[in-house]
Amino acid sequence: MQSNLDKIAIQLTSEISESLSRCGLMFRIFSRVKTESSLKHKLEVKYADKKVKIQDMIGIRIVTYFHDDIDALALYYSVGDVVKKSIDELDSSTFRPQRLNITSRIPADMVEEFKTALPENYRDCIEPTYEVQIRTVFSEGWHEVEHDLRYKCKEDWEGCESYSRALNGVIATLETAEWNMKAIFAEMARHNFSHSDYTAMLRNKFRLKFKSEKLSGCLDDHLRANTHLAEAALNTDRLIVICTLLTHKADFNLTYDNLFFLINRIEMMDFDLMAMEPAETKIMLDTFLNS
């Protein structure tokens, strides 16, 4: 039974990983299936009345390298067959981590296999859903420590509010580090623009895994002669570009040239730049944006 659930978890994880890899995001992804002992414990402690069913029999965690990638993924995974979203509002007066958990339905073609694979004694207590948790790489380690050493043993922390607050303060420090890291790359991108290093500008602005080493000579020369186009790309909202790459399903060859041509299509619409698109690139962009 467990192996069949593992197979479903691997398939779901693979589909998510393929989508994120296609758009060049830097990430790690993990999945787990609740063991029968974990399931029994959770039902006894948290769902004793059985009015609320377990929704995270399968859990998937996406770990991003940058905090603003979470905004794109939250937007992307908030549409579709979503059952529940748990996205904490940030409170400037309180030290605590921000939860971003999204519960979605198991795809229809997997539901029967999912139900059959469940432990027979608990089938009525489990919904055909899975949970996606989104964290940054900095906060991932903190969450693992907090989950095992505080969340699972709350009685240890009774009367230790100052220590609990201090532990929350660690996540605040990590979040500050995340924002500082993002700011460093933003400043780097502006520095690159001012020195006409447009490949580095794109790399530091968008922070993606590109499939080429640099801009082509002809496009780089065109940007040097038309610096307003490079500046427009620098000022483009990264979230819009990432969401575009996520939501369109056709293949996209993520080179520096192709990204710049895509930005032009969705933001600038410079016809001279469109005229520079190689025939193969034009077909790819047309197919991608219509997918």
List where the protein language model places each region:
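An acidic, glycine-/histidine-flanked metal-binding catalytic module
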Residues: 2-11, 19, 126-291
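Generic secondary-structure boundary/loop-capping signal
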Residues: 36, 51-54, 134-135, 139
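Long beta-strand-rich cores associated with HINT superfamily self-processing modules
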Residues: 63-183
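Intrinsically disordered, low-complexity polar/charged tails and linkers
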Residues: 1-43, 54-57, 63
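Short, exposed beta-strand "edge-strand" segments with a Pro/Gly-rich flavor and a Y/T-containing core
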Residues: 26-34, 62-64, 89, 196, ...
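Short secondary-structure boundary micro-motifs
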Residues: 2, 45-48, 86
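Charged, often glycine-rich, active-site loop that binds/positions anionic groups
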Residues: 41-47, 271
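Short, flexible, solvent-exposed loop/turn segments with mixed acidic/basic and small polar residues
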Residues: 47-55, 121-123
